[in-house]
A protein has these predicted regions:
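Extracytoplasmic/ectodomain regions of membrane proteins and secreted proteins
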Residues: 41, 140, 153-161, 171-174
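Extended terminal
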Residues: 1-10, 58
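Terminal hydrophobic membrane-targeting helix
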Residues: 19-115, 135-136, 140-142, 146-152
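Outer-membrane beta-barrel architecture
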Residues: 101-105, 158-164
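Extended, amphipathic, non-transmembrane alpha-helical segments
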Residues: 114-123
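Beta-propeller and related beta-repeat scaffolds in trafficking/envelope systems
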Residues: 43, 55, 80-82, 89, ...
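Hydrophobic membrane-insertion alpha-helices, especially the h-region
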Residues: 6-22
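Flexible, solvent-exposed coil segments and beta strand-coil junctions
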Residues: 66-69, 122-131, 163-170, 188-190
């Protein structure tokens, strides 16, 4: 009887470990959370519409949390849209269970997008005089990149963010005397 209970206990532990490893490598794809995620985004800013097909949920063994990967994300802001290459979030299970702010980090990737289109989207999300000036100075160009940000317990963005990317075919006119044309450059903001 003791051998049988021991074997059952070992099988249960091994099956749970297998399940955790499966969730950490393959995860679960679902459309169940799509409307919830879209509603949360609209609650932050009613002008933003996030479109995507599926959500993939993975277990993060190192942080004892969840990784949320949104498949084929596209952001629309007042008729202007941009395709994102990735949209991933890290969520703390402990904070989620305590009903606290659970978002730990976010990773946003942008496919090659027209720089004026991106400025228009950002300006509609968070208006800034700098963006209005930049829209007049920047004549054309493409931008792509990845942003990694971390959040504190209250939901504010921490200062340890990292933005990397590439600007290509960039043209600008500063005042009437200075022109930049066909500039290709990598950038990194830390």
């Amino acid at each position: 009887m003791i051998k049988w209970i021991t074997r059952l206990f070992i099988v249960l532990i091994l099956s749970q470990l297998f399940f955790l490893f499966f969730l950490s490598f393959y995860g679960v794809e679902t459309t169940y959370f799509n409307s919830t995620i879209q509603e949360k985004v609209r609650a932050l800013n009613p002008n933003i519409n996030l479109e995507f097909q599926k959500t993939k949920i993975l277990f993060d063994i190192k942080q004892l949390g969840l990784k949320i990967k949104i498949r084929n994300p596209k952001i629309n802001v007042k008729g202007t849209s941009a395709n994102l290459s990735k949209l991933n979030f890290g969520i703390s299970i402990e904070s989620l269970l305590k009903d606290e702010f659970a978002l730990q980090n976010g990773e946003f990737g942008l496919f090659k997008t027209d720089i004026k289109q991106l400025i228009k989207i950002i300006n509609q999300i968070k208006p800034s005089p700098f963006l209005i000036i930049a829209k007049k100075i920047f004549k054309e160009g493409k931008i792509e990149g990845v942003a990694e940000i971390n959040f504190d317990n209250t939901g504010k963005i921490q200062d340890d963010y990292k933005i990397t990317g590439l600007v290509s075919d960039f043209n600008a006119k500063i005042l009437k005397k200075f022109r930049l044309s066909q500039i290709d450059s990598n950038f990194e903001l830390i």
